[in-house]
Amino acid sequence: MKFGKRIKEQIQESLPEWRDKFLRYKELKNLISSPAPVESIFVGLLNAEIDKFNAFFVEQEEDFIIHHKELQYRIQRLVEKCGHNDEMSRENISEIRKDIVNFHGEMVLLVNYSNINYTGLAKILKKYDKRTRGGLRSPFIQKVLHQPFFKTDLVSRLVREWETTMDAVDPVKVAEAEGYERCAAVTSAAAGEGIFRNTVAALLTMKEMRRGSSTYSAFSLPPLNISDSDNVLRSLHLSSPIPIP
């Protein structure tokens, strides 16, 4: 699949409020196709895009850190209260389970956001160099590697932590740990289909982009720093609303 089509589909699959935060790949491609693309205009547009990526990524990352702490507190309270009021425990476990799955999904989407925008920059720079016979790509990508939106280590670590937590908050496991038999009857709540679909699409896109080239280069994406997508999907304890290859 050509990248232009891939990023268009990814934007459509993304959360509505995220859709104007992605790389304006088609606009940049059209600029390159003009009779005499001006480097200063092209670089100015790229820098504006990077500023947009950084602002959005940092804002999301900060929100995730806050949400991470809030969810940890809620889980601690849930474990303390489990069994004292069975009906309340049942509702609380169901609610927090859904919140965790949604939170995990949003973080996966942010990692994918970083990946696909970086890939788009590398590809559009390659097209520019080919069109102008220039050498802009290599020095520009070196700058990109130090941008906040490219540094996904923190978010990837939180993704892995919450994959583990999703198992720990499995109602059956909570019941076994706390010794409350009635809590074991509580089933996991299904997360919203929309966020689940978006997360699945993001995971598959990340795998596809890394599979797209058989050779490693300075412009290749780093290894995927979250669990294999198939394992992530299984860890959700949910039936996928769309087929998973």
From Swiss-Prot:
Bridged cysteine pairs (disulfide): none
Taxonomy, superkingdom: Eukaryota
GO biological process: cellular response to phosphate starvation; positive regulation of cellular response to phosphate starvation
Induction, per UniProt: Up-regulated under phosphate starvation.
One Pfam family it belongs to: SPX
Entries under InterPro entries matching the protein: SPX_dom, SPX_prot
Domain SPX positions: 1-142
Transmembrane stretches, start-end: none
Function, as annotated: Plays a positive role in plant adaptation to phosphate starvation and exerts negative feedback regulation of SPX1.
Protein name, per record: SPX domain-containing protein 3
Organism name: Arabidopsis thaliana
Name of the gene encoding the protein in the UniProt record: SPX3
